[in-house]
């Protein structure tokens, strides 16, 4: 499962959210458009392209056309998992994250990827697969669905005490 917010990944997002602490993000990204697709929709697109004569020798972007600013996406994370965000100066953000190995690529990821508006025209793949944009899971629904699944699958160690408490409560 991937949970991304600008250049941050799930390990940082969840650790901070569960601790009740904010994540720090670059102010420069707050109004930049991003496109994120739920993996289930991408797999449906793939399945409809395999052995599809209309897909031969073609290149496709497998994505939704739904897009939001990173600021809007941050609000989804707040609504779904309680994640708080503080927006700060970009150079200060990069200083906090570090720019030496293994993080030496963060500046480039931010400046040459995440700070560019990413709005996808998926009309070609929709036309070839016969799918409609309305069939896609919305970003907020996808994040919520995956967050709920993650919580169900999280392993917190042996959980012996929790199991004994559960057994006691069932008596």
Predicted regions located by residue number:
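Structural element of the ATP-grasp superfamily
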Residues: 17, 124-126
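Short aromatic/basic micro-patch
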Residues: 36, 67, 119-120, 136
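Glycine-rich Rossmann NAD(P)(H)-binding loop
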Residues: 26-32, 60-67, 78-80, 112-113, ...
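Mid/C-terminal beta-alpha module of Rossmann-like enzyme folds, strongest
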Residues: 45-109, 122, 144-171
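A conserved structural motif in NAD(P)-dependent oxidoreductases
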Residues: 35-42, 138
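A conserved pocket-lining segment of Rossmann-fold NAD(P)-dependent short-chain dehydrogenase/reductase
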Residues: 15-37
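Flexible, glycine-rich beta-alpha linker
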Residues: 1-14, 32
């Amino acid at each position: 499962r991937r949970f991304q917010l600008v250049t941050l990944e799930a390990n940082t997002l969840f650790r901070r959210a569960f601790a009740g602490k904010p994540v720090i993000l670059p102010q420069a990204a707050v109004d930049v458009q991003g496109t994120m697709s739920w993996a289930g929709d991408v797999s449906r697109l793939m399945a409809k392209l395999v052995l599809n004569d209309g897909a031969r020798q073609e290149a496709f972007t497998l994505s939704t056309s739904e897009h939001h600013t990173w600021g809007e996406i941050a609000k989804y994370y707040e609504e779904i998992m309680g994640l708080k965000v503080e927006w700060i100066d970009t150079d200060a953000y990069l200083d906090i994250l570090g720019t030496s190995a293994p993080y030496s690529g963060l500046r480039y990821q931010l400046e040459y990827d995440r700070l560019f508006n990413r709005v996808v025209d998926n009309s070609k793949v929709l036309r070839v697969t016969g799918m409609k944009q309305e069939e896609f899971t919305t970003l907020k629904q996808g994040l919520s669905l995956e967050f709920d699944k993650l919580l169900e699958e999280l392993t917190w160690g042996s959980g012996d005490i929790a199991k004994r408490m559960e057994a006691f409560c069932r008596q």
